Amino acid sequence: LVKGEAGAGKTVLMSSLVDDLLNSEDISFIKDNNYINLIVNHNNQLSVYKEIERKLNWNSGSSLEVAMKPTQFLNALRKEKIKAGVVIVDEGHLLLTAKNQAYLGGNHLIDLLAQSKVVVLVYDDKQIMNKSQIWTDNTFFELEHEANLEGNLIELRNQMRIKANPETVNWIRRIIDDCEIKKLTKDKQYDIRIFDSPFELQKAIKLKNKDQKLGISRLVATYDWPYVEEKKKQDRPKWFVEIGDWKAPWNQQIKPEKKDAKLSWIEQPQTIDEIGSTFTVQGFDLNYAGVIIGPSVKYRNGKIMFDISESKNKGAVQNRKLENGEMKNFGEDLLKNELNVLLTRGVNGLYIYAVDEELQEALKEAIL
């Protein structure tokens, strides 16, 4: 079990571990006796791993591809009547802990443990996004305790993504973890700005994106405006983030060029005109992240609060049925996790616009 906050380097560690398992002479004996697979329950992350798999010519050792989503992988094991060897799970917090229409098991991790010799799981409970990913009993704590007793619990403590001084990293973490906005002295290394309008924010991010020496810059937002994924791409966008007389389309609506279709959302050039969400940016680095904080995040009486009535993320704000049949709402925690993911994408800068006037004012006053 490998634990680490957003930006701790979990994905880099996992992809290099898989590559070592598949290609290193020193540990070739592991591959000789085991199938090697990399599992991630996130479409855009999967597309990146698929590209690595193709370029590096990865071979799992079985009839299955190396990189797969968990439900697809478990179904394939059943169909092929084989057991897994070493299974590396990236973004382990996105595994399901409840069945749905496509997945009839009760818990992805429990099923993976039952079907594999070794599972390496990367995990951050502050990045759980959906009620169906929450552990509603003590099973995960028991697994964590067991891993710790056996010396199999690793914690990544360094911040590898955000290239800022510790005060700036702490300022961002205080917003997320403590719901507090403290004063922040300007950081020469890391550019944090609060914009007066979404127009200005969009313009600034587009300008940053023109120079991609340090990476791609994109606009993202909390899921506070309606969006339904269309099975078939429409000729023109249908779902928008709208603030006053400004609007921009939600992610995955502008058709990519054919050559870019298999790339992740952030790597497709046309997405500079769209607004990303946790569904498209979780797990990724951006050079500059432009974050629109929607009306579900408010600032009242010196504290940030989360208003589930303003969120359009049904998977986060609807009740979850517990083992005893009781219904429980985890919405506020999940909206906090959503903000965590969005505010921790930028490597060199974070640009913000907040819809809530009191939040916007508090953020502007905080930056000295």
Show where each model-derived region lies.
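Conserved helicase/translocase motor-coupling segment
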Residues: 129-135, 145, 149-169, 177-303
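Conserved lysine of the Walker
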Residues: 10
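Hydrophobic positions on the alpha1 helix immediately C-terminal to the Walker A/P-loop
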Residues: 13, 17
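Conserved Walker A/P-loop ATP-binding site and its immediately adjacent core
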Residues: 32-51
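C-terminal accessory regions
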Residues: 120, 269-368
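Hydrophobic anchor at the beta1->P-loop junction of P-loop NTPases
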Residues: 2
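Conserved RecA-like ASCE ATPase "motif II neighborhood" in helicase/translocase motors
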Residues: 56-115, 273-277, 338
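Signature of the SF2 helicase/ATPase Hel1-core->accessory helical subdomain module
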Residues: 88-156
